[in-house]
Amino acid sequence: MTASLTTKFLDNTYENPFMNASGVHCMTTPELDELANSKAGAFITKSATTLEREGNPKPRYISVPLGSINSMGLPNEGVDYYLSHVLNRQKKYPDAPAIFFSVAGMSIDENLGLLKKIQESEFNGITELNLSCPNVPGKPQVAYDFDLTKETLEKVFAFFNKPLGIKLPPYFDFAHFDIMAKILNEFPLAYVNSINSVGNGLFIDVEKESVVVKPKNGFGGIGGEYVKPTALANVRAFYTRLRPEIKIIGTGGIKSGKDAFEHLLCGASMLQIGTELQKEGVQIFERIERELKDIMEAKGYTSIDEFRGKLNSL
């Protein structure tokens, strides 16, 4: 019995549910091409701002024993760079499944401007609006402000009619899950992506008695194994609260087929990999695909739909 990882997401069919997390291995055209030619089912661009951004001073990304700490500050080549890349790729491979395009403006107005540019372009893929970057000094995460989130989405959907998902930060309280889900259910969202890194963690070099990243006095977003339980909880919480039309992309702590299986069991439709992709490179997709298939075949599953979202309670 052979397990299939074929994944239907919106109107697209992907060979498997795996993709990069925006921010990892997607800064430049060569990196994006490498993703496209890898075993990943899909890929997403670097979160784009209107103009090129250098980001925060280095060191700003450090691998630590169970994951990573980063305070990148949204370095990117600017929206026109990535839009040109995806439009060229659409023309070259018209039958390929949809590309994901990420934007992360520094303000509501910038986000609206970015989305208007995408709306007016020939881009026919899926857009992700990042409302949860924790690493830009002086810029709070929009998605922790429920009123501002609702205001943003009202303005976005007044004109934007292409498929749109949003990337959320982690939440830690049932009341916050309830409030955010109620807001999101009011809008024609394609998906939510849970989670972005756990913001404002601190990692210390004991020998130097120092922090390990330079920006924000060492405070940075935490990724990797550290965040998997939080990521799973957020995936599950939104899967059980959102309208079934709003899909879930699970992100956080995926480094093995077992981790992927857990995210899918909680209700995720697609899976993004960040920290472990940074450590291992694009060959990770082939390994995790094989490991997930092995788990499914051992359990007698032939497709992901047979177990997605079917997490048992005690």
Swiss-Prot record:
<dbReference type="Pfam" id="PF01180">
    <property type="entry name" value="DHO_dh"/>
</dbReference>
<dbReference type="InterPro" id="IPR005720">
    <property type="entry name" value="Dihydroorotate_DH_cat"/>
</dbReference>
<feature type="binding site">
    <location>
        <begin position="70"/>
        <end position="74"/>
    </location>
    <ligand>
        <name>substrate</name>
    </ligand>
</feature>
<feature type="active site" description="Nucleophile">
    <location>
        <position position="132"/>
    </location>
</feature>
<feature type="active site" description="Nucleophile">
    <location>
        <position position="133"/>
    </location>
</feature>
<feature type="binding site">
    <location>
        <begin position="46"/>
        <end position="47"/>
    </location>
    <ligand>
        <name>FMN</name>
    </ligand>
</feature>
<dbReference type="GO" id="GO:0006207">
    <property type="term" value="P:'de novo' pyrimidine nucleobase biosynthetic process"/>
</dbReference>
<feature type="binding site">
    <location>
        <begin position="274"/>
        <end position="275"/>
    </location>
    <ligand>
        <name>FMN</name>
    </ligand>
</feature>
<dbReference type="InterPro" id="IPR023359">
    <property type="entry name" value="Dihydro_DH_chainA_dom2"/>
</dbReference>
<keyword id="KW-0560">Oxidoreductase</keyword>
<feature type="binding site">
    <location>
        <begin position="196"/>
        <end position="197"/>
    </location>
    <ligand>
        <name>substrate</name>
    </ligand>
</feature>
<feature type="binding site">
    <location>
        <position position="224"/>
    </location>
    <ligand>
        <name>FMN</name>
    </ligand>
</feature>
<dbReference type="GO" id="GO:0044205">
    <property type="term" value="P:'de novo' UMP biosynthetic process"/>
</dbReference>
<keyword id="KW-0285">Flavoprotein</keyword>
<comment type="function">
    <text>Catalyzes the conversion of dihydroorotate to orotate with fumarate as the electron acceptor.</text>
</comment>
<keyword id="KW-0665">Pyrimidine biosynthesis</keyword>
<feature type="binding site">
    <location>
        <position position="130"/>
    </location>
    <ligand>
        <name>substrate</name>
    </ligand>
</feature>
<dbReference type="InterPro" id="IPR033886">
    <property type="entry name" value="DHOD_1A"/>
</dbReference>
<dbReference type="GO" id="GO:1990663">
    <property type="term" value="F:dihydroorotate dehydrogenase (fumarate) activity"/>
</dbReference>
<dbReference type="InterPro" id="IPR024920">
    <property type="entry name" value="Dihydroorotate_DH_1"/>
</dbReference>
<dbReference type="GO" id="GO:0005737">
    <property type="term" value="C:cytoplasm"/>
</dbReference>
<feature type="binding site">
    <location>
        <position position="130"/>
    </location>
    <ligand>
        <name>FMN</name>
    </ligand>
</feature>
<feature type="binding site">
    <location>
        <position position="167"/>
    </location>
    <ligand>
        <name>FMN</name>
    </ligand>
</feature>
<feature type="binding site">
    <location>
        <position position="195"/>
    </location>
    <ligand>
        <name>FMN</name>
    </ligand>
</feature>
<comment type="pathway">
    <text>Pyrimidine metabolism; UMP biosynthesis via de novo pathway.</text>
</comment>
<dbReference type="InterPro" id="IPR050074">
    <property type="entry name" value="DHO_dehydrogenase"/>
</dbReference>
<keyword id="KW-0288">FMN</keyword>
<dbReference type="InterPro" id="IPR001295">
    <property type="entry name" value="Dihydroorotate_DH_CS"/>
</dbReference>
<keyword id="KW-0963">Cytoplasm</keyword>
<dbReference type="InterPro" id="IPR012135">
    <property type="entry name" value="Dihydroorotate_DH_1_2"/>
</dbReference>
<comment type="similarity">
    <text>Belongs to the dihydroorotate dehydrogenase family. Type 1 subfamily.</text>
</comment>
<feature type="binding site">
    <location>
        <position position="46"/>
    </location>
    <ligand>
        <name>substrate</name>
    </ligand>
</feature>
<feature type="binding site">
    <location>
        <begin position="252"/>
        <end position="253"/>
    </location>
    <ligand>
        <name>FMN</name>
    </ligand>
</feature>
<comment type="subunit">
    <text>Homodimer.</text>
</comment>
<protein>
    <recommendedName>
        <fullName>Dihydroorotate dehydrogenase (fumarate)</fullName>
        <ecNumber>1.3.98.1</ecNumber>
    </recommendedName>
</protein>
<dbReference type="InterPro" id="IPR013785">
    <property type="entry name" value="Aldolase_TIM"/>
</dbReference>
